[in-house]
Design a protein with these regions (language model features):
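ABC family nucleotide-binding domain
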Residues: 3-156
Length: 156
């Protein structure tokens, strides 16, 4: 079996005296589909924020392809280009079309060419069923459609 893409070992996170995550262990292997489920306030978002370098765990380790992500803090943008996250509030730019929302991070953060970013954005918008809405602004989309644009943006 190949090395896990993501390995979480004994991860804990506290905010003051409030323990949000305690001794979390799991791995994600190539081809896996993984769901994180739990009650409201159970730490799902905190776990994802730790994985995406938006929070620092209190203890434990997160390995990405066998490397501890603590050692790649300076390369957070490069790491995040492989580990996407869709927020509960989709954080789409209201003045931009669905297509532009999916391109902006690629051109500004990842420094891809506009042509490359557009091709990637179109590919993922197609995959999530949003190709007919590439020119629509977020105000013209339903909540579910906005979510699909946010997913395409995370994948692109």
């Amino acid at each position: 079996m190949s090395e896990p893409i993501l390995q979480i070992n004994h991860l804990s996170k506290t905010f003051g005296s409030h323990e949000v995550l305690r001794d979390i262990d799991f791995s994600v292997n190539p081809g896996d589909v993984t769901s994180i489920i739990g009650a409201s306030g159970s730490g799902k978002s905190t776990l994802l924020r730790c994985i995406n370098l938006l929070e620092t765990p209190s203890s434990g380790e997160i390995l990405y392809h066998g490397k501890n992500i603590d050692h790649i803090k300076c390369g957070a943008s490069a790491y995040r280009s492989h580990v996407g996250m869709v927020f509960q509030s989709f954080n789409l730019f209201n003045n931009m079309s669905a297509l532009k929302n999916c391109m902006i991070g690629q051109t500004k953060v990842l420094k891809k060419s506009k042509a490359e970013a557009k091709a990637s954005a179109l590919h993922y918008l197609e995959k999530v069923g949003m190709a007919p809405y590439i020119n629509a602004k977020p105000s013209q989309l339903s909540g579910g459609q906005k979510q699909r644009v946010a997913i395409a943006r995370a994948l692109a």
